[in-house]
Amino acid sequence: MRATVPTLDSLQGLALGDAFGDRWFSVSPDEAPAALAARLPRPAPWHWTDDTAMALVLVRHLVHNGEVVQDALAREFAGEYAAEYGRKYGPSMHGVLRDIGAGADWRTVTAQQFGGQGSYGNGAAMRVAPLGAWFSDDLDTVARQAELQALTTHFHPEAVTGAVAVALAAALAARSRGGRPPGRAELLTEVAGRLPDSDVRSGLRTAARLPGHTTVRHAATVLGSGFQISAPDTVPFALWSAAGQLDSLPEALWQTLEGWGDMDTTCAIAAGVVAARTGLTGVPAAWPAAREDLPGWVAEV
């Protein structure tokens, strides 16, 4: 199957956001306020991380299969990890992906994490925006496919719900291409309304109620911005940021960055959602030039 334009746009945006955000980890907290105020991008090169590596696996999987085939996808994630394990994977994912790669059943591996609770990290959410764009014609399918891909690495319901939320937001952004974008509260409320009772849903509802004049720092304080590397601490803020800037990918990235936190992942999520609507329109040419290239197959699908 061929990838849709919104899917590839979302992938390109996600990779740009990932690399853009990750580059700011080299800025000290003392230097950060002035650097952010000046809005000077960090020097090249911008390398992408596990967010993009796993999104690439997911998109290639959809091209080959048309839907999520969990056993195959789990093996493909493990294979990518084995090939480039230095892409800054989260602490728990090293063991998960090594064990799957060694032949263990992904269901057993993921369910054993954290005393049988499973990981509720943001890893399933960080990679999923292109999937939302792929299935954007049917929001029920978006939710189900996002859940299936999440479960291959993350057993905890909050991690799964975070992935579903991001995929739904990307789908709604993709559906709005060429028309009026949904308002921030409108998009966040629509996404939250399709989620099960969870901390992620509560965070999105809180985000939808924040006044229009809310500063980024206040939103990050209220919602969290990934300092805990969890889905509830990451997804509501990233989607709040994206939903307020659906017509400007650069503005979405600068705004998301102001929240600090897990910057590669919050920026990857926000950019993956916004780019499902805008592509890289409006992005300074120097930014994609600074970003590490994606594999050649991306241009062929």
At which residue positions do the language-model features occur?
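Structured, active/binding-site neighborhoods that engage oxygen-rich ligands
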Residues: 1-301
